[in-house]
């Protein structure tokens, strides 16, 4: 008799339906591209995840960088205890916190009785932004992922100024021609103005002859590859043979070049992607 009652209890419990949480974008309809003034999302019922009634609040961040080290750019919304029909937005992002492009993902941090659940979207494009990232950690993270916060155009030396974060990987001085920046990676940093009267700075070796350099050091090599476009691969070459010459950026067509992200190869670590159907909040 006791065994029969226990089986009945287990059978009844198996039919209890808990309303679980699922997040999706409302506008735009997909997570691929959105305007900076139109980001909305909603809670929906799901057959997996954490029961909706257990969630006390969720904070939505828009981030750049990587999932392992997210760099929050802004808090979009702090949700109270949600319901299956609750919706938030549209939200506007400050235009100046970063550049436009496929650089951003959403981080939803939900608090419930058992702890905290972190969920992340895939990268998506935010249109209409006009700012820049000052934090070099964001640059480094995006470069490691194959996603870069600047889409260079082949406009000569100004391209190099835009590609690399200020203050890293280069030493600048002004050449004899007023206003022209040069880079001198193989000698000490000179004064702000470099003229013929500057005699206290000596190059580490002969730098005016390309043949001398290649004899002892070999030809210049590629120092960095920047994935800045879905159709072109930009490669930066440093010309160490002359401190007064600029690096060269080569654009190579790369049909079908696709970005990489931190969880494409490690799906079990990332939790759900917001907007996936029939999935709820998963533990990260």
Curated annotation (Swiss-Prot):
Compartments in which it is found: Membrane
Entry GO terms, CC: extracellular region; fungal-type cell wall; membrane
UniProt keyword annotation of Transmembrane helix present: yes
Disulfide bond annotation, renumbered to this chain: none
Highest taxon of the lineage: Eukaryota
Residue ranges crossing the lipid bilayer per the database entry: 88-108, 144-164, 212-232
Keyword Signal among UniProt keywords: yes
Family matches, as InterPro entries: Kre9/Knh1 (IPR045328), Kre9/Knh1-like_N (IPR018466), Kre9/Knh1_C (IPR008659)
Keywords, in A-Z order: Membrane, Signal, Transmembrane, Transmembrane helix
Signal peptide: 1-21
Major location category of this protein: membrane
Pfam families cross-referenced by the UniProt entry: Kre9_KNH, Kre9_KNH1_C
Any single biological process term in GO: fungal-type cell wall biogenesis
Membrane topology: Multi-pass membrane protein
Protein name as annotated: Uncharacterized protein C11C11.05
Organism listed in the record: Schizosaccharomyces pombe (strain 972 / ATCC 24843) (Fission yeast)
């Amino acid at each position: 008799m006791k065994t029969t009652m226990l089986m009945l209890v287990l059978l009844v419990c198996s039919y209890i339906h808990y309303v679980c949480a699922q997040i999706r974008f409302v506008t735009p309809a997909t997570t691929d591209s959105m305007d900076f003034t139109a980001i909305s999302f909603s809670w929906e019922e799901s057959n997996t995840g954490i029961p909706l009634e257990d969630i006390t609040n969720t904070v939505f961040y828009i981030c750049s960088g990587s999932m392992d080290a997210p760099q929050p750019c802004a808090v979009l919304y702090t949700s109270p205890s949600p319901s299956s029909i609750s919706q938030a937005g549209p939200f506007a992002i400050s235009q100046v916190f970063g550049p436009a492009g496929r650089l951003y993902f959403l981080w939803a941090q939900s608090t419930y009785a058992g702890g905290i659940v972190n969920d992340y979207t895939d990268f998506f494009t935010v249109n209409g932004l006009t700012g820049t990232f000052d934090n070099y950690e964001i640059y480094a993270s995006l470069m490691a992922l194959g996603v870069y916060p600047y889409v260079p155009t082949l406009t000569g030396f100004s391209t190099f100024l835009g590609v690399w974060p200020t203050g890293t990987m280069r030493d600048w001085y002004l050449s004899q021609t007023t206003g022209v920046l040069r880079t001198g990676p193989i000698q000490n940093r000179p004064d702000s103005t470099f003229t013929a009267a500057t005699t206290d700075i000596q190059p580490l070796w002969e730098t005016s002859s390309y043949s001398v350099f290649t004899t002892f050091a070999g030809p210049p090599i590629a120092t960095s590859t920047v994935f800045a476009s879905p159709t072109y691969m930009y490669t930066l070459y440093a010309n160490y043979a002359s401190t007064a010459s600029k690096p060269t950026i080569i654009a190579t067509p790369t049909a079908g070049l696709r970005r990489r992200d931190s969880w494409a190869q490690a799906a079990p670590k990332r939790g759900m992607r917001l907007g996936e159907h029939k999935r709820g909040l998963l533990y990260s």
